[in-house]
Amino acid sequence: MTPTRAQLAAFVDHTLLKPEATAADVAALVTEAAELGVYAVCVSPTMVPAAVQAGAGVRVASVAGFPSGKHVSAVKAHEAALAVASGAAEIDMVIDVGAALAGDLDGVRADIAAVRDAVGGAVLKVIVESSALLALADEHTLVRVCRAAEDAGADFVKTSTGFHPTGGASVRAVALMAEAVGGRLGVKASGGIRTAADALAMLDAGATRLGLSGTRAVLDGLG
């Protein structure tokens, strides 16, 4: 059954992570988020105060180690903790994709665990850059990384930053990730979801959250 506009909106993190975003842009994002009835907004750590100050009762998410993941774990953890202290209720952190490709799952787990410990009860989503893992390794690697995220205390696994040259979310990746975590964790599809058809395909594949920057266009596409 096709969801209603309100039902689809409830899956969405309305996202603005462009480096040129201003506090005014974030305030407009929050206003639009409240109008559209989305689950949350997702903004850069420096923009969390602006999102909180914009009010409207909208849940705020932020990012850590974004977008490369090539940050010392202690830096990711501190960045995430600062975002939570500023009012973020959720953190989307980026793994070290190179470590994952090298088979260093202990390092991947330790990196995630450091952020998990730093954010307390905040929701932790782990961005695995699924397109890179599939393009540069294989399905087994993606599954193993998702299970490592679960072992380290993640609440969600997330496909993509949307900034990696190998691409964003795919139905194939979402299905593999959903199977890997077996309903024990959420699955967030993000990156390149531009139409209602894209969004519905991700939900059908097992996504439980969607990261969208063009949320209004996606919702309007439901007809």
From Swiss-Prot:
Gene Ontology molecular-function annotations: deoxyribose-phosphate aldolase activity
Uppermost EC category: lyase
GO biological process: 2-deoxyribose 1-phosphate catabolic process; carbohydrate catabolic process; deoxyribonucleotide catabolic process
SMART domains in alphabetical order: DeoC (SM01133)
Alphabetical list of CDD domains matching this protein: DeoC
InterPro entries cross-referenced by the UniProt entry: Aldolase_TIM, DeoC, DeoC/FbaB/LacD_aldolase, DeoC_typeI
Active-site residues per Swiss-Prot or TrEMBL entry: 92, 158, 188
Involved pathway(s): Carbohydrate degradation; 2-deoxy-D-ribose 1-phosphate degradation; D-glyceraldehyde 3-phosphate and acetaldehyde from 2-deoxy-alpha-D-ribose 1-phosphate: step 2/2
Subcellular location per the Swiss-Prot or TrEMBL entry: Cytoplasm
Biological function: Catalyzes a reversible aldol reaction between acetaldehyde and D-glyceraldehyde 3-phosphate to generate 2-deoxy-D-ribose 5-phosphate.
Name by which UniProt lists this protein: Deoxyribose-phosphate aldolase
Biological source species: Mycolicibacterium paratuberculosis (strain ATCC BAA-968 / K-10) (Mycobacterium paratuberculosis)
Protein's gene: deoC
